[in-house]
C-alpha cells in the first residue's frame, strides 16, 4: 500500500458515471473510516477503475493498493471498462446503451488487430474468407456475445 502517482485518461474517466454529490461524500467517509479496501485498477499507470477513490485517497493521504491490468491495446482497455461498468447497478438505461455500443466498437477494433496478427479467438476457420467476409463474421460473433452478456438482442448491440 502506498500513494503511487497515477495518470488519468479523460476518455476512460468519461466512460464511468460520475458519482452524485451524496455518493461521493459517502465514499469519502467510508475511505476515511475504513481505508481503501479495493485496489485502484491501472493499465501502464493509467487509472481504468477507481478514479474517485484515487482522488479522495490522494487528497487525504490514504494509502491504496493498485491492480495492474494487461490489455493488448487502448481499445481493449475501453472494452474492459465498459463491461465492468455494465456490471454495476447504478447506471441509467441511456448509459447502459452507450456502454454496450462503446464495448462493441472497441471489441471490433481489438478483433481486427488480433486477426491481423493471427490471434483469432474463434474456432471457426476464417482464413479462407476475404477480409470483408471475415470482418463481418467477427462483428456478428462479437455482437452476439455482448448481447447475451447484457440480455439484449444482437441487433440492439449493432
What are these regions (language model features)?
Residues 44-49, 53:
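Acidic, metal-coordinating catalytic cores used for nucleic-acid/nucleotide bond scission
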Residues 17, 42-43:
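A generic secondary-structure micro-motif detector
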Residues 4-7, 41, 65-70:
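General small-molecule cofactor/ligand-binding pocket signal
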Residues 12-28, 32-34, 53-158:
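Amphipathic, charge-rich alpha-helical segments that serve as recognition/docking helices
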Amino acid at each position: 500500500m502506498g500513494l503511487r502517482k497515477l495518470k488519468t485518461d479523460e476518455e476512460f474517466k468519461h466512460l464511468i458515471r460520475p458519482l452524485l454529490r451524496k455518493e461521493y461524500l459517502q465514499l469519502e467517509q467510508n475511505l476515511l473510516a475504513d481505508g481503501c479496501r479495493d485496489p485502484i485498477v491501472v493499465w501502464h499507470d493509467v487509472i481504468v477503475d477507481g478514479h474517485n477513490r484515487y482522488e479522495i485517497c490522494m487528497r487525504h493521504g490514504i494509502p491504496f493498493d493498485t491492480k495492474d491490468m494487461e490489455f493488448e491495446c487502448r481499445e481493449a482497455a475501453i472494452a474492459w471498462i465498459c463491461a465492468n461498468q455494465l456490471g454495476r447497478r447504478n447506471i441509467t438505461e441511456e448509459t447502459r446503451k452507450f456502454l454496450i455500443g462503446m464495448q462493441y466498437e472497441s471489441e471490433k477494433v481489438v478483433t481486427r488487430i488480433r486477426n491481423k496478427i493471427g490471434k483469432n479467438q474463434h474456432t471457426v476457420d476464417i482464413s479462407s474468407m476475404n477480409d470483408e467476409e471475415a470482418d463481418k463474421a467477427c462483428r456478428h460473433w462479437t455482437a452476439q456475445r455482448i448481447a447475451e452478456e447484457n440480455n439484449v438482442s444482437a441487433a440492439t448491440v449493432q
